[in-house]
Amino acid sequence: MSKPHSEAGTAFIQTQQLHAAMADTFLEHMCRLDIDSPPITARNTGIICTIGPASRSVETLKEMIKSGMNVARLNFSHGTHEYHAETIKNVRTATESFASDPILYRPVAVALDTKGPEIRTGLIKGSGTAEVELKKGATLKITLDNAYMEKCDENILWLDYKNICKVVEVGSKIYVDDGLISLQVKQKGADFLLTEVENGGSLGSKKGVNLPGAAVDLPAVSEKDIQDLKFGVEQDVDMVFASFIRKASDVHEVRKVLGEKGKNIKIISKIENHEGVRRFDEILEASDGIMVARGDLGIEIPAEKVFLAQKMMIGRCNRAGKPVICATQMLESMIKKPRPTRAEGSGVANAVLDGADCIMLSGETAKGDYPLEAVRMQHLIAREAEAAMFHRKLFEELVRASSHSTDLMEAMAMGSVEASYKCLAAALIVLTESGRSAHQVARYRPRAPIIAVTRNPQTARQAHLYRGIFPVLCKDPVQEAWAEDVDLRVNFAMNVGKARGFFKKGDVVIVLTGWRPGSGFTNTMRVVPVP
């Protein structure tokens, strides 16, 4: 599938793990991996950073963008609308500070993460800060009686979910505070449960509750979510990470709230419980993408099965050509330490090898002591892992999995990626209005970066969701002659690629363009040497 280096002339060749990428078998591929081989020049995986107290200043955000942040995530489980509006303003100020040089400008997307249908405990002894100690083996009564809403203690605990007695059985487990405290149901009443404390500990007020295996019937979109989503539409966010999605109708509900004004906002469904995993296919069809939210998922399903769910979801998203994000505890120890554990390094690399389009940081950048180091570490790990992909096998399988179609763009995308392997192209340049052409090319996972040139700022920002797309925003005025306008944008991409070190004079690039103006007409492929 690859030509020997001697035949390739003096062109810059993406030699990174090339020997391994083009092996015949998986075992051979593993044997050929070489620690002295350089990493991929351009990182293909998107990096999503949660913005919080540790990272919301304009100065820190500028450094995070330089370090590799592509998407800024705002967690609406915390903070007021005023707080988030200020954060969004800071993200945009930091992004636009690079706008003076169109070659080096990096569009950064803003993502709104909804609170979703959570279950929470009441107040401990009427105070938000009070705590009680739950002893292992003790009996704890769970009640729905509102008289105890602010009077919880070590003997009785109020929950805000009225149907809990209908959805749990005797023997069911109830987890509180991210699984730190576990209870087992011993007896059921009409409006109470008697439980035994299996894992004790210190319990504070208003803690999250998980009911693994239970079919929780809370509304997919709460009143708070509706207000938050409307706020997101006003603020022109690029994507919504919808929490606790359990079925396709939940996604439709989010879409309905976003309305006509928010119709271009991408909806990424977070899979966080057993029902979401079970009904994954219908959720995938209704969504623009998926997030593997390993935090709650690791409580809702056994911890040892999380990797299975991750691989299954990433595989199905890759097959469907939809973006997938791997999230939670990616570099958790970097909240307090400047270097990750070896397991975390492997975890991030394996998410990339599995096929994740984006990797996410949560507390590491929101409240950690080393937000910039965490971004840089993900950047370095992702580049190494991308070089180590078994590209030959992956491409063959993606082609086999794609159905026969009269969609011209599908054939163009497949052909251009195959050509990029054959001629060891340094990059693929795609001119795109809606982003669809670039998304289709990304689906076939080329080794080389896809430089997507667009004049639409939102298309550029949302393209970060897809593996391999390096979006660039062309601000030059549209030329009257179509051919001249095409040349202008291709030359702009060439200049960006050279400035970024993706290729140099004499290298080969694949150029995908349309034969006439407008969206949906990409049908011309050229193999071009870099001037």
Curated annotation (Swiss-Prot):
There is a cross-link at residues 115, 266, 270 (Glycyl lysine isopeptide (Lys-Gly) (interchain with G-Cter in SUMO2)). K(+) binds at residues 75, 77, 113-114. Pfam families: PK, PK_C. The gene is PKM. Substrate binds at residues 73, 270, 295-296, 328. It comes from Pongo abelii. The modification N6-acetyllysine is found at residues 62, 89, 166, 266, 270, 305, 322, 475. Its EC number is 2.7.1.40. This is Pyruvate kinase PKM. Has high pyruvate kinase activity by itself and does not require allosteric activation by D-fructose 1,6-bisphosphate (FBP) for activity. ISGylated. The modification Phosphothreonine is found at residues 41, 195. Mg(2+) binds at residues 272, 296.
